[in-house]
C-alpha cells in the first residue's frame, strides 16, 4: 500500500514537472500573440518573424531563421513595450520631441548635388533628403518626425500610431513574396518593410546604392538612388535581385517591390492634395477624413487580360499614365514610373487610413504575375500559381521631380501635368502634332456584325449590315448640312473577317456593306472628312490562316488558354459557351506588318489598331513567352512604324506609351472611377496632351448624363464624340452590338451638329495651346481653364455647369441649345 502511494506520488510529480514548461509556453505564447496582435493592427504589417522562420524549411537556413526569430521576438517585445509607453502613462518628457528640417539635415551627409537639387543621406535613420536649392524645400523619403508624431489614430481608445507602424513608415523600401509551398500558394498579405531587412549603403559619385537583405524571406536586392539634373532617379535592376530558393516545392519568390512608399508624406497638420491617374485624373485632399474607405490602389494601363477573372471585374476607369503627385502650397513632388511601368500599381492614402497618420502616394511594382483557378469545380479550393522562370522586366524605376510655382502662389494641377508632359517630350519623343485653329467632330461608325437569323426554320449566323458604306456617307452628309465643317470618323468592322471576329489585316471591304467601290468613294468623300478604317485584332472567335487558335492564343500563368469570358449582368459569373481567344502578343508584329503593307499598297492615309492602344497582355507559354513589358515594347514599335508610314494614326483611347506616335485620340475620359477616397475629378490627362495631340471625349450619347459629359468635355478642351449606327436598335438586339442600343443616328445628328458648332467657336482658337491652369469653384459648378502659347496672350475659358454657359474673355456663350434635357443641381 505504501509503495503504491509512493508510486502515485512520483507519477504525479513527473506529470506536474512535464506540465510546467507547457504552462510557461502557453503564457509566453499568449504574450507573443498579444504583441503580434498589436503589430498586426498597423496596416500592411509583416508576418511575424517566428512564422517566417518556421516557414523557411531549408536546413541550411535553420540557424539564420532561428536567429531572425529570436531577434524579431525581442523586437516585438520592445515594440509592445514602446507602444504601452506611448499610449498609456508616458510623460511629456519621455516623448520623442519633433525636429526641424534643418535639424534633420544636420544628421545627414551630403552625397552629391546638381545646379538645382542636392541629395543627402541619413544612414542611421534609413532616410534620404532631396533638397531644392531655389525654393529651400526639403523632400524626405520618410517623415522626419514619425517617432514624435502623436496624432490620434484610434479615436475610440485615444491612441497614436503603434511602434511597429512607425518603423514601417520610416522604411525606405518594401517587398512582397509568394510562398510556393503546395499547402500555401499565397502572396504575403502585406508588404515586408525594410526595417525587417539588413540594409547596407554604398556611396558613389551619382548617389547611393542600398542593398536590402531579407534573410527570412530569402530575397536580396539593390536599389539605386541616382541624382540627375532635375530629379531623383530610384531604380532596381532585375539582374541584381537574388532569390535564394525558387523551388516549386518549398521556395519563395519576389512578387512586388515598393520604392520609398512615404516619399514626401504629409502629416495631419499639412494642407494640400494628391493627384492620381484614375481616368481623367482625380484629386485626394490631405486629411479628408475618409478613413473608413479603402485606400486608392489601381493598376496602371489596366489589368492583364491574359488572366481571366473568375467573376466579372469591377467597372472602373483606366489609369492611362504612370504618374502621381503630392502638392502642398507652392511646392510639389511629381512621381513618374519610368521603368517597368507596364507592371505597376498606383497607391494613395490619407491620414487615418490603415491606422497611420500620413498622406502619401507611391508606386508598387509587380515582379511576377499570378493566376488563380479552382480544382475539381470546387469553388472553395482556390489555387494560386506564380509566374515561373525568373523576373522578365529588366528594370523597375521611379523618377521624383520636385516642382515649385514661379510666383510663390499655390501650385496648380497644370503645373504637375507640365512636368509629366516634359518627361514625355524629353524621354519618350512626344512632339506637337495639334493643328492651329482646328476643331473636329469625332464619330464612331460600326459596319457589320454577326446575327442569328432563322431561314425556313433553320438557324443561321449571318453577316448583318449595321452601317454600310453608302449609309455612312448619308450620315456624314446630314452632319455637314447641319454645319459640321470637319469630321474624324473611326470606322469599325468593315471587312468580312472583322465582322466574323477573326484576325483581319488586309484592306478588303465587305461586300455586305457595299464592296470596294462604295468604300473607295467613302474614303475620298471630302477633304474635311477624315475616314479612319480601323481593325481591332485583340481577340478572335475562330482561327484563320496564320492565326490559328491552337497556336496563336495567349497562355495564362496556369498554362491554360486565355479565353475571354462574358459575364452575367445579374450575377457577375462567367457565362457558358464559346469564349473568344486572346491573340498572343507574339503575333502583334505580324499584325502591324501586314496591316501597314496592305494600307500603304491601297494608298490609305489613316489607320487605327483598336484595343492595342489601351490593353496590355502577357503570354506565359514555355516556347515564346511575352511579359507585359515586352508586349508594351512590341506595341510601341508597331505604332512607331505606323507613324513613319501613315499620316494619320488614330487611337481609340491611349495609354501614355503610344502618345508620341498617334495624331488623334478618342475616348479620353472626363470622369474618374469615383473611388470613395477621392474628392473630385480633374482633366489631368487632357492637361498633359492638349496642344500636342488632338483628342476627343468619350461618346456623349453613351453617357448616362450626356449634358454633364458635354460640359466637362468643353471645360477640358476636348472635341465632341458620338457613336452612330444606321440600323435601328432592334437590329442590334442579341448581337455583339446590343450595347449600342442608343446609337441610331437619327436621334443625335441635330444635337451633335449644335454642340460641334458651339465647341468649335469656343475651342478652335486654342487648339494648339497648352493648358497652364485649371480651377474649380467651391461648389465645383464653374470650371475655369487657362490656355497659353508662346508669343500669344493667354485665353481663359470658364464653363458654368449650373447655368449652361461658357465665357471666353468678356463674351458669354449660351449652351442651352447644346443641352438635351437640362442639368439638375
Segments predicted by a language model, with ranges:
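Long, acidic low-complexity intrinsically disordered regions
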Residues: 48-82
Amino acid at each position: 500500500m505504501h509503495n503504491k502511494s509512493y508510486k502515485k506520488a512520483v507519477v504525479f510529480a513527473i506529470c506536474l514537472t512535464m506540465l510546467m514548461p507547457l504552462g510557461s509556453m502557453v503564457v509566453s505564447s499568449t504574450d507573443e500573440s498579444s504583441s503580434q496582435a498589436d503589430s498586426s493592427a498597423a496596416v500592411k504589417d509583416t508576418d511575424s518573424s517566428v512564422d517566417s522562420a518556421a516557414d523557411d524549411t531549408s536546413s541550411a537556413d535553420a540557424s539564420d531563421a532561428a536567429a531572425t526569430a529570436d531577434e524579431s521576438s525581442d523586437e516585438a517585445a520592445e515594440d509592445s513595450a514602446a507602444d504601452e509607453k506611448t499610449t498609456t502613462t508616458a510623460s511629456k518628457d519621455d516623448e520623442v520631441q519633433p525636429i526641424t528640417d534643418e535639424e534633420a539635415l544636420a544628421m545627414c551627409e551630403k552625397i552629391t548635388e546638381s545646379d538645382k537639387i542636392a541629395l543627402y543621406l541619413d544612414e542611421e535613420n534609413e532616410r534620404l533628403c532631396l533638397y531644392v536649392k531655389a525654393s529651400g524645400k526639403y523632400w524626405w523619403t520618410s517623415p522626419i518626425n514619425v517617432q514624435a508624431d502623436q496624432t490620434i489614430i484610434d479615436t475610440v481608445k485615444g491612441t497614436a500610431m503603434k511602434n511597429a507602424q512607425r518603423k514601417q513608415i520610416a522604411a525606405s523600401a518594401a517587398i512582397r513574396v509568394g510562398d510556393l509551398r503546395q499547402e500555401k500558394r499565397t502572396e504575403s498579405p502585406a508588404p515586408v518593410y525594410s526595417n525587417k531587412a539588413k540594409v547596407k549603403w554604398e556611396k558613389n559619385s551619382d548617389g547611393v546604392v542600398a542593398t536590402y537583405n531579407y534573410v527570412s524571406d530569402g530575397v536580396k536586392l539593390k536599389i539605386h538612388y541616382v541624382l540627375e539634373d532635375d530629379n531623383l532617379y530610384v531604380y532596381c535592376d532585375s539582374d541584381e535581385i537574388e532569390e535564394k530558393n525558387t523551388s516549386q516545392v518549398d521556395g519563395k519568390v519576389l512578387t512586388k517591390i515598393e520604392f520609398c512608399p512615404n516619399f514626401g508624406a504629409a502629416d495631419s497638420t499639412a494642407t494640400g492634395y494628391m493627384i492620381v491617374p484614375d481616368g481623367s485624373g482625380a484629386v485626394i485632399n490631405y486629411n479628408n477624413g475618409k478613413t473608413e474607405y479603402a485606400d486608392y490602389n489601381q493598376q496602371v494601363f489596366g489589368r492583364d487580360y491574359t488572366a481571366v477573372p473568375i467573376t466579372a471585374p469591377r467597372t472602373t476607369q483606366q489609369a492611362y499614365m504612370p504618374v502621381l503627385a503630392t502638392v502642398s502650397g507652392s511646392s510639389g513632388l511629381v512621381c513618374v514610373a519610368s521603368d517597368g511601368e507596364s507592371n505597376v500599381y498606383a497607391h494613395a492614402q490619407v491620414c487615418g487610413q490603415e491606422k497611420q497618420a500620413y498622406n502619401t502616394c507611391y508606386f508598387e511594382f509587380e515582379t511576377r504575375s499570378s493566376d488563380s483557378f479552382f480544382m475539381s469545380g470546387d469553388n472553395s479550393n482556390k489555387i494560386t500559381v506564380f509566374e515561373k522562370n525568373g523576373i522578365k522586366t529588366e528594370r523597375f524605376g521611379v523618377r521624383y521631380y520636385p516642382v515649385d510655382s514661379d510666383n510663390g502662389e499655390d501650385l496648380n494641377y497644370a503645373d504637375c501635368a507640365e512636368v509629366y508632359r516634359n518627361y514625355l517630350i524629353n524621354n519618350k519623343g512626344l512632339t506637337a502634332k495639334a493643328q492651329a485653329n482646328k476643331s473636329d467632330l469625332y464619330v464612331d461608325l460600326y459596319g457589320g456584325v454577326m446575327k442569328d437569323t432563322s431561314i425556313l426554320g433553320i438557324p443561321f449566323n449571318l453577316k448583318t449590315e449595321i452601317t454600310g458604306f453608302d449609309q455612312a456617307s448619308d450620315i456624314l452628309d446630314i452632319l455637314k448640312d447641319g454645319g459640321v465643317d470637319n469630321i474624324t470618323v473611326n470606322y469599325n468592322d468593315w471587312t468580312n473577317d472583322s465582322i466574323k471576329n477573326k484576325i483581319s489585316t488586309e484592306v478588303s471591304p465587305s461586300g455586305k456593306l457595299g464592296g470596294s467601290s462604295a468604300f473607295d468613294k467613302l474614303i475620298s468623300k471630302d477633304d474635311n472628312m477624315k475616314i479612319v478604317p480601323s481593325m481591332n485584332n485583340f481577340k478572335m472567335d475562330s482561327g484563320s490562316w496564320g492565326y490559328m487558335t491552337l497556336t496563336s492564343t495567349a497562355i495564362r500563368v496556369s498554362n491554360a488558354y486565355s479565353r475571354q469570358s462574358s459575364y452575367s449582368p445579374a450575377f457577375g459569373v462567367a457565362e457558358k459557351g464559346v469564349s473568344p481567344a486572346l491573340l498572343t502578343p507574339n503575333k502583334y508584329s505580324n499584325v502591324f506588318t501586314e496591316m501597314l503593307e496592305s494600307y500603304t499598297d491601297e494608298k490609305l492615309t489613316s489607320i487605327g489598331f483598336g484595343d492595342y492602344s489601351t490593353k496590355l497582355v502577357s503570354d506565359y507559354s514555355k516556347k515564346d513567352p511575352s511579359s507585359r513589358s515586352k508586349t508594351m515594347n512590341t506595341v510601341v514599335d508597331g505604332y512607331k512604324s505606323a507613324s513613319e508610314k501613315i499620316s494619320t494614326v488614330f487611337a481609340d483611347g491611349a495609354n501614355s506609351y503610344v502618345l508620341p506616335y498617334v495624331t488623334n485620340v478618342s475616348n479620353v475620359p472626363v470622369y474618374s472611377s469615383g473611388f470613395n477616397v477621392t474628392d473630385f475629378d480633374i482633366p489631368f490627362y487632357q492637361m498633359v496632351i492638349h496642344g500636342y495631340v488632338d483628342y476627343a471625349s468619350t461618346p456623349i450619347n453613351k453617357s448616362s448624363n450626356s449634358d454633364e459629359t458635354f460640359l466637362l468635355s468643353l471645360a477640358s478642351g476636348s472635341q465632341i464624340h458620338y457613336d452612330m449606327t444606321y440600323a435601328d436598335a432592334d437590329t442590334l438586339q442579341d448581337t455583339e452590338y446590343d450595347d449600342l442600343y442608343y446609337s441610331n443616328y437619327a436621334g443625335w445628328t441635330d444635337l451633335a451638329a449644335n454642340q460641334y458648332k458651339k465647341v468649335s467657336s469656343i475651342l478652335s482658337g486654342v487648339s494648339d495651346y497648352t493648358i497652364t491652369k485649371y480651377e474649380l469653384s467651391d461648389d465645383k459648378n464653374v470650371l475655369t481653364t487657362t490656355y497659353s502659347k508662346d508669343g500669344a496672350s493667354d485665353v481663359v475659358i470658364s464653363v458654368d455647369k449650373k447655368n449652361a454657359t461658357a465665357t471666353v474673355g468678356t463674351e458669354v456663350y449660351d449652351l442651352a441649345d447644346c443641352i438635351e434635357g437640362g442639368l439638375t443641381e
